[in-house]
Amino acid sequence: MTSPRSDTRPTPLLVLDVVGLTPRLLEHMPHLRALGRAGSQAALSTVLPAVTCTAQTTFLTGTLPSEHGIVANGWYFRELGDVLLWRQHNGLVSGDRLWDAARRSHPGYTVANICWWYAMGADTDITVTPRPVYYADGRKEPDCYTRPPALHDELTEKLGTFPLFHFWGPGADLVSSQWIIDATRHILRTRRPDLALAYVPHLDYDLQRYGPDGPRAFRAAAELDAALAPLLDDARAEGRTVVALSEYGITRVSRPVDINRALRRAGLLEVHTQDGMEYLDPMTSRAFAVADHQLAHVYVRRPEDLDAVRETLAELPGIERLLDDEGKKENGLDHPRSGELVALAEPDAWFTYYYWLDDARAPDFAQLVEIHRKPGYDPVELFMDPLDPYVRIKAATAIARKKLGMRYRLAVVPLDPSPIRGSHGRLPTSDDESPLILCSTPRAVSGRVAATDVKSLLLHLAGLH
């Protein structure tokens, strides 16, 4: 087969990562539904864990975590002795990226990444990714990182500062997705990249707060669809092929599982105390878990402790299965970054990161939106503490201090995980809960598309066979 001539422009693509999109939600999204009906639509077989960083990396490399190395949204960095989530450097990803393959067929192929993960340091032409300003006095202010650097001021002047506190936290809402959509429209209009990747997270918020199958979820779907409509119109007018896909479907949950507390009670997890606050001590713990929604990597320091860890977790309600070396290999998770064991939650359960046994000894970051300090994922950051009668006064005071340029602590996150009603991370058990892939091109997709086939599909749609 001959390669396309480099002087023939590939078919331009817009790839929308519509987080949490499922068949049930699509019924409330007329613009996206029309795109699939005029073009094509299929179920998408996701990867384990079905979480953002892992799924996106599989889409872009065509490989499983066992090869690309992104085993979750975060993991235990053994060489550092630290748990780190939501890193941003593309150097953590192994393998041939979509744009690498595209440029072999078409030198000069241009790519814009608007808020897909592991954007920093990637060999893309245009980058926009959340990146707060961390001041020396401890303040954190909203902002973003861009390449080329001049794009930062261009977007900020046109759209305002990247709305970080609407991207995650108690205030997370449509505002962040709207900013990303508007930034994508601006980049398509002014830069015309061959490939534009855009991440729209709106369905991640109320579906985790209130569940995926009620009026709030359906309203969120309708809101996002209306916000996407002008971008879809722009792409159609330009002759740009649109692919909309999702990383996972969010399912209803009601049972938080305190996996680290179980390990601590068994004498396997260690903490150290400073100023009356307990901190996880991963370097001395015999075992601990890095919780990520419905999957947890369980790190066991010595092989002789594996049986004790298995026995402890076998007795913990809410765990469906523990993957050992063979189980990890079966599920594409056999990578050095994975835990010695991997715990999967039952369908209606999810894992907390909590390791303290007394809330009075919780670290102060537990009640903050602190995605980089917590040794595990904390969806409760989407809420303000309903048990604190002064929570809104505290929030208003903190915001006032922030506006005055003073240090502030927005300590409003509850320590009770029970409000969470939606989660993800397991492989779906039904098509209703499965992610989707839609394409504006007829007959481009059908039946079921594997996440590992998305890369080759996009190359085909671009005309880069």
Show the residue positions of the predicted features.
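Short, structured active-site-proximal loop/turn typified by the sulfatase FGly-forming signature C/S-X-P-X-R
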Residues: 24-67, 110-112
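Short glycine/proline-enriched loop/turn "hinge" motifs that connect secondary-structure elements
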Residues: 6-8, 187-191, 424-431
